């Protein structure tokens, strides 16, 4: 089982965060029940941001799917922590 999850923010300092306290327990249960990897989906506005509640430390996230506007310095930090970065480019969807 894989998990594809959203968040309010992701950073080296706080890991995967949310603004909604009730989401923390749901996210923790999802992560605990994964037999493969956790894929976090976060657009550039959430990269390097810390929200109120931590759902997972950065070590619990194996993949980050984000867009081409994500700050490269933060992506490099996440990469150095073992997170695999998958950047989606607008041109990928144009015909």
Segments and roles (model prediction):
Residues 1-95:
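Conserved phosphate- and dinucleotide-binding cores of soluble alpha/beta proteins
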